[in-house]
C-alpha cells in the first residue's frame, strides 16, 4: 500500500511538473506573440497597406520628379521599417510551439524585402518588369500575412 501511495505521489509530481512546463511554454508563446509578432504585423501593415495608393500616385506620371521622389520616400521609409522588423524578429527566439508559424513569418518578411528591392530597382531605370515583379511579390506577401493572421487566431494558448 505504501508503494502504491508513493507511486501516486510520484505520478502527481510528474503531472504537476509537466503542467508547469506547459504553462511556461504558453507564457513564452504569449510573450513572443506580444513582443515580436504583434509589432511586426503592425509594421508590415505600415509597409504594405500604403503601396496601392503610392503606386497609383506614381502611375499618373512615372517620369514626374516629384511623384518619383514621393515614391522613393515611401520605399526608404519602408526599408527602415523592415530593418526594425528584422531586429525585432531576431530579438527573441521563436518558441518551439510556434516554429512553423515563425518560419512562415520569416518567409513573409523576406518576400516584403525582396519586393522593396525590386521596386527600388524600378526607380533606378524605369524597367516595368521590376515594377511588375515588386507588385506581385507584395501581393503574395499580403496574402501570406493574411494567412499568418488567421493562423495566429488558431494558435492554442491555455
Model-derived segments and their meaning:
Residues 13-14, 94, 123:
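Residue-identity detector for threonine
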Amino acid at each position: 500500500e505504501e508503494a502504491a501511495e508513493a507511486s501516486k505521489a510520484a505520478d502527481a509530481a510528474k503531472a504537476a511538473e509537466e503542467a508547469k512546463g506547459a504553462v511556461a511554454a504558453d507564457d513564452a508563446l504569449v510573450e513572443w506573440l506580444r513582443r515580436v509578432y504583434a509589432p511586426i504585423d503592425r509594421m508590415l501593415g505600415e509597409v504594405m497597406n500604403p503601396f496601392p495608393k503610392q503606386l497609383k500616385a506614381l502611375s499618373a506620371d512615372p517620369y514626374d520628379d516629384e511623384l518619383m521622389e514621393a515614391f522613393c520616400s515611401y520605399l526608404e521609409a519602408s526599408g527602415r521599417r523592415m530593418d526594425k522588423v528584422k531586429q525585432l524578429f531576431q530579438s527573441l527566439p521563436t518558441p518551439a510551439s510556434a516554429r512553423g508559424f515563425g518560419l512562415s513569418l520569416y518567409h513573409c518578411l523576406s518576400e516584403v524585402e525582396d519586393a522593396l528591392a525590386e521596386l527600388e530597382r524600378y526607380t533606378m531605370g524605369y524597367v516595368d518588369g521590376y515594377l511588375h515583379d515588386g507588385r506581385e511579390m507584395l501581393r503574395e506577401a499580403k496574402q501570406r500575412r493574411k494567412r499568418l493572421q488567421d493562423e495566429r487566431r488558431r494558435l492554442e494558448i491555455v
